[in-house]
Amino acid sequence: MPQRMPPSSRHPRHPRGTHRQGGIALFVVLVFVMLSMLLALWASRTSLFNEMVVGNDADYQRATEAAQALLQDAELDIRGERADGGMCTGTAPVCRQGSVATMPVEAKDVANLLADLETVSTGPRCKNGLCLKRTGNQDFWNESDANTGLAAMQAVGTRYGTYTGAKVGDDDAPANPILRNTAAGQGGWYWIEVLPYTPDAANASLIAGGNANYLAVNVQPNVIYRVTAMAQGRKDSTRVVLQQTYVRHRLKD
């Protein structure tokens, strides 16, 4: 009589010595994914930081160039010249024509200009970018006083090309964007302090034990100009201030 075979199991048995996966592969994958995300985040933050550094440096360099251009414009304003060395020509207020304060040419002009600036009763004693010697703190760009601080000085400062006719560029010939920006509190300005000195300085001994005329000067009138130029960058945190002393030395006849 034939023997009946037992029914085969639908679920085969695992051979002895083998083990089922306990989820370690998934854990390893998650760890690598998290590490990849951290590396990507670090790379993006590094790139953003480098971009900020480069952007800040570019803005500072642009503001420095604008301040240097303002100093040169102030020198031309003092000499009454154009950038090519020719005499200043144009319509008011270019070349300080019209009812604006003018550069002194003779000694009497110095006295008249200083007397006119003395009549300013409120705020900085300045007119059209010409100022008396500042008293007190010299770094007005760091002051918050409404009457003598930066905001008050900006109101009496001179923009690039106002009295020299220098062009700030256009779309076809772009110039420094800071110089083109004339919005309130933006762009650049310069101020010229008129500092008279005694004519006896020309014959004074400038170096102890030196000759009386060790440095012969021929200045008419006897005035030194202290020029301060300030350029506000495209970012609020960028500001460049340059200052120089300028003496217009005249050739003897």
Please provide the spans of the model-predicted regions.
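Terminal alpha-helical segments
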Residues: 2-6, 11, 16-253
